[in-house]
Amino acid sequence: MTASSGTPPHQTVERARELREQLGTAQHEYYVLDRPTLSDQEYDRLFRELQGIEAEYPTLCTEDSPTRRVGAPVQSAFSPHRHLVRMLSLDNAFDLSELEDFEQSLKRVVGDAIHTSGYTVELKIDGAAVALTYREGVLVTAATRGDGTDGEDVTANVRTIRGVPLRLHGDNHPPLMEVRGEVYLPFAGFERMNEARVAAGEPVYVNPRNAAAGSMRQLDSANTAARPLRFFGYAAVLPDGSAPARSQWELLEQLSAWGVPVAPHRQRCHTIQEAEAWATVVEHETRATLGFAIDGGVVKVNDMALQDELGIRADRTPRWGVARKFAPDMALTKLRRIDVNVGRTGVLTPFAVLEPVDVGGATVTFASLHNADQIAAKDLREGDTVQVVRAGDVIPYVLGPVPEQRDGSQQPWSMPTQCPRCNTPVERYGDDVAVYCPNVACPGRQLEGLVHFSSKDALDIDGLSYARIQQLLDAGLVHDVADLFDITVDQLTSLERFAKKSAENLVAAIAAAKQQPLSRLMFGLGIRHVGAQAAQLLSRQYGSLDALMNATAEQLGAVRGIGSIIAQSVASYFADPTTRALMERLRARGLRFDEPNAVQADGVLTGATVVLTGTLPSLSRGEATALVEQAGGRVTSSVSKKTTFVVAGEEAGSKLDKAKELGVTVLTEAELLEKLSGASADASADASA
């Protein structure tokens, strides 16, 4: 599109402003609130529309436009940047005793005032520190920590991180301020990035922290934009060294209100013992569920006035804070051998058999190796000394070998050419990195398929453990999922270690699983590419298994949130005569083939576009969205002339103002529920007539 040198029409100016607002709101909901209301497809459509407007009228491309995140080549090497105030590093504490020593050092300066203040405790993100300078609420500079006084200007790269606000929300921000935080890579994104590097023949990153730091120093920010980086803020300073808040807790709340992502699981603690209790829970329970790396917690004096009074030590560490470090989440051990597991779809997955080693407080004997390409890229050999990581990951994985410790006895490894469970020649499809066993009767595939079918997110069959399923397979009692529903108490009690009560409980649990809704059955079938969310979307849209089985790939792909790959996979699965025979066997055994929360084709909100804003009295955002969608409506994130109505709660803000301005109907939660219950009453009356 050729750029226009003329003045853009008023409606185009307004549309560009509206798009920037919609996309900014969507990014805030996704990256900060973790409550997205705009689908990826809708976001991409709006993004492309804004790109088109800005290409035609370059004067409409503002500094805070979401399109400015895409990335552009840096013209020269990184320039030095002087921080507004020196970035400090915290001292460390490794247990309660050292935290108590820290508190005693505080009391020597401020006495018992520390008890009035208390502490704010936060996660210590294992990433790359950056400082973001905002002038009049607009991001103007981003820099690395450097030596604490001077860092490197990485503005072009940081602008590509969607969680970093290009313009702060609200209008109560200082004229000039530096927001500090950590750029990090979630574990899932780190794995995807390394897989892409393997496919491209590039060396893999050793850990997420190194990957985040390396991403900040890309000379072409388009490379940074392609990486799934995230950001958490933890501090803000003004030019005079003060903070724009009276307490650390208030500062974190203010950062969040400005649209800056803040790490979860922060807490106010009245005593240092409470801070240690928090750290213990985070280290041994929370850490494994986070999905990103942390290497400890941070304990800070909450009162900012006391922080100022405490000041810094001669070694340039602040007296008012300390890092409560956790046990290392990486360890070295011996890679005894590499074995291969066969998954439910036939994928052969190599895994490491290790000499037992303590990693992050747990003994690790097995670890993930992902696929043969990654093993080759890392040059892993049986007998190697390897680095094993468990941080934040339920399944430990091998980062790489320690080549310096090789003595010549280590042996290279290659993927077997035959399935280790059934000896069928393996196959590799196109450019897929995975290797498959094509035999649907493979014992390995049968075992993993049954385990998945009975898992918690599928039919949730209590008592049907991995070992029990293996026992049933070995006894010839089951070969596929339909066979489970033919098992009797007498058959089970004839097996070893199966008491009558246990057998009765398992048969009862299998019978109860017949009443699970279609969405759980769909997920349990183990259709390639179909996760729990996709299964739920399809089941709610079609309402019955028969309707799903008869849908074409094109029809399935039209369901919001279902892409062409999933649609084709589902259509191909149900087109297979073997699958259809299995479905009839399940039907004959009384399984439920309908979805109770299916979208109503003629629902009261069919065709309606609804916006939810503010805090509703009793419904969460997710619950309200589900009710609207079940009634046939669609929930969007922004108000326009096409909006049917807005449901407003407390602190509704700009969306409510926009609705009133456009004359869009505004409902309370009670009015929404009345509208929905009225539809239910009408339906009941029709049914009884």
From Swiss-Prot:
Function per UniProt: DNA ligase that catalyzes the formation of phosphodiester linkages between 5'-phosphoryl and 3'-hydroxyl groups in double-stranded DNA using NAD as a coenzyme and as the energy source for the reaction. It is essential for DNA replication and repair of damaged DNA.
Segment forming the signal sequence: none
Any one annotated GO CC term: cytosol
Family: Belongs to the NAD-dependent DNA ligase family. LigA subfamily.
Catalysed transformations (reactions): NAD(+) + (deoxyribonucleotide)n-3'-hydroxyl + 5'-phospho-(deoxyribonucleotide)m = (deoxyribonucleotide)n+m + AMP + beta-nicotinamide D-nucleotide
Cofactor(s) named in the record: Mg(2+); Mn(2+)
Annotated protein name in UniProt: DNA ligase
Binding positions for NAD(+) per the UniProt entry: 40-44, 89-90, 122, 145, 182, 300, 325
The keyword DNA repair is assigned to this record: yes
Domain BRCT: 600-689
EC number of the protein: 6.5.1.2
Active site (record annotation): 124
Keywords: DNA damage, DNA repair, DNA replication, Ligase, Magnesium, Manganese, Metal-binding, NAD, Zinc
Pfam families named among the record's database cross-references: BRCT, DNA_ligase_aden, DNA_ligase_OB, DNA_ligase_ZBD, HHH_2, HHH_5, Nlig-Ia
Entry's Gene Ontology molecular function annotations: DNA binding; DNA ligase (NAD+) activity; metal ion binding
HAMAP family named in the record: DNA_ligase_A
Binding-site list for Zn(2+): 419, 422, 437, 442
Origin species: Gemmatimonas aurantiaca (strain DSM 14586 / JCM 11422 / NBRC 100505 / T-27)
GO BP terms, alphabetized: DNA repair; DNA replication
InterPro entries, sorted: BRCT_dom, BRCT_dom_sf, DisA/LigA_HHH, DNA_ligase, DNA_ligase_AS, DNA_ligase_CS, DNAligase_adenylation, DNAligase_N
